[in-house]
Amino acid sequence: MKTLRTLCVLMILSGVIFFGLKIDAKDIDIPFLNSLKKVVSDSDTDSAANSKKELKGSAKPLDVILYNQMDAPRLYNGCEVTSLAMVLNYAGYDVTKNTLANQVATVPLTYSSGLKGDPNDGFVGDMANGPGLGVYHRPIYQLAKTYAGDKVSDLTGKSISAVYQQLEKGNPVWVITTANFTPVDNMQTWKTPNGTIEITYSEHSVAVTGYDDKYVYLNDPYGYKNRKTDRTSFEKAWKQMGSQAVVIQK
């Protein structure tokens, strides 16, 4: 309604300027004109606030503890829970990768019906020794909430800027990517109890710790702390894997 009234006033004023319309001062809605000043002022304030939310362009790699999924007791396919353990630890929750492995939801690699497990429901297959695939954001988010409650946010489906914003706030981010942090061409189609999904055995999970204009830094549960990887390739791989991300606020 305010927008409509604003347009009407602008049309009237335009008529005054271009067609010489005569308007008596008593016919002008002075309070409304004053309200227009407030709208403009509020708009300027909002713009200033939004500009403060813009990315700085970099975030120095955080000192997040590194856990190796291959350390005993080994989790051959346990990159997701190992990365979650790093993020939880940074937020102040003392938990091991193997504890999380025992707590995360699981589903079979292959059902008796021939259907495949859905990583959106739980870890698919055998995490410790294989064969297995992995687990996606939803079960990880649910598991993280049992520790950190409302401090956990699922950023899945948002733009990469949402991840970088969290890094600038000092929060490492759990993500799904690929093993070499570049898009892959070996995607497979699986029929699951929930329908058809696209998967790859090249799926991998890491804890993102920082970024700049060229690189993304991450704790790789294969044993690399603040590993530097090409930002453009990483973003493409992350998007290919469904833009999955979970963060725990400090």
From Swiss-Prot:
Signal peptide region: 1-25
InterPro entries according to UniProt: Peptidase_C39-like (IPR039564), Peptidase_C39_single_dom (IPR039563), UCP032442 (IPR016997)
Endoplasmic reticulum is among the record's keywords: no
Domain of life: Bacteria
Keywords annotated in UniProt: Signal
Keyword flag Signal: yes
UniProt protein name: Uncharacterized protein YvpB
Organism: Bacillus subtilis (strain 168)
Gene transcribed to yield this protein: yvpB
